[in-house]
Amino acid sequence: KAINAKSDNMRVAGKVVSFQTKLQQAVEMVIQVAQHFAGVDIIIVCDSWFGNNGLFKPLRTKLGNFVHLLSRLRSNTVLYSIPKIGSSKKPGRPKKYGSRLGSCAEMAAAFMAYASTYHVFLYGKYREVNAYSQIVMLKTLKCPVRVVWVFRKTQWIAIFSTDLKLSVEQIIEYYGARWKIESGFKEIKQDIGSSKSQTRNAQAVINHINFSIMAATIIWIYGSRLENIPERRHKVKGRNSFAFSDLRHIIAKSALSDDFHAVCNQDNKLPRKSFLEALLRMVG
């Protein structure tokens, strides 16, 4: 409503912001990034909500065959075989799809016994993963895709890629890396506080999210340059790596230390010093 009313608080750089759906925003951002990598294959890794023609078609139209999609398949998605190219010419246009193979869940049950073990670098270490791969036709994207069924003890997931050159290991590793992005969103929204912004101005909202992303990036750069690996404050079984909150605690502790005060000028003491110290302790 505010955008349609062309309110002053909906202006960015003096221009009124036009309404865009999530898919339209995603397409625009990917195209902006792709302009810096001309002639290079681009793989978009996303969840099943974005893994459809609403994202893929406009990207292919704008960027061509250099862009590929890697996403998760829904269990009820129907898959088809690759159409056979016959030597005999029949009237009408050639078939785009072969025979119906079944739903993703039906094929998972059929392929479970034929799964192979792959050595995949996943979540910080090499793991053995049982998976099965097959190239099929996907009607939602209207193109051939490589589907990888990953089988766990009691569950399974199906991942697909429009880039048929990718190996099974690469498809699993790329999709597994997506969860690092999910944790990054959590850090920016909850730990940094982006979701708690009280701004009502479009430009202020953009500035706030940019500063939040910058703050999270600086914290991780700081953590990568530490000589010793930080100790995890909240122990979790099976996890040895440190968390984002551990880095925040180290930075807050360092900012309140005598060494930090020795570097900073303490001659001009501000009346808000105690308040700033309280904020730093809260951050830690």
Residue ranges and their predicted role:
Residues 1-284:
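Single, function-defining residue in the core of a domain
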